């Protein structure tokens, strides 16, 4: 596994001076726009993006619509053809001091998320996919659970939105790390959504961040590694993320994905269960491929 490198962020783009593009060695303060006073963020909403400027703007605006003052947004542009700052400029967000943007050559989602982790200053990392949005009460719900439980890792229910429907997807809760680990490896549908996860930054850093040796299933590997270290994510039974289903977020690389699953099962499953789990995973991936082939 390639370790998380806290002092090796590669920031190469030449950008307008008024845009905050930060190396980890030069952090800036977040300013409360109402009082113009510095605020140390509690939450760093981390977004990795490539070539989704319009969706990125929607994601960022959803964060600000929560009204939370102790939040920063860290955006890592992972080699977009059109730099993300152009979309931010068009949306009037270019000089917003709550946004911290790093543009870097394309190195993949794991490296982009590690860059965001290195730049972030909040106590908690809230992961947000660039095509997802937070609900207006997201931080109210997250704060309530974090204060009540002291949990270092939270996953949540979410809203799934299509052109014709909208529904809340309820996630299961688990009593122990081994129970959740088995579910992650065998359930046809993942028992968590990475977007919306909120993780104590120190815990995520101590785990080594994201595994840059993996190209896909990066979120799954991270959760499995946490579970192996006896960290049990706690479920928040409220949807805090709006997930808009569209063609570009449906995986069509089932064979590649199946190979990644085999590797994860070999790494994290008990030896006596590996063949059975691989059979379960093969059947579920073939079934999902069939659903994708005939259309949703």
How should these model regions be labeled?
Residues 2-255:
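Nucleotide-sugar donor-binding/catalytic module of glycosyltransferases
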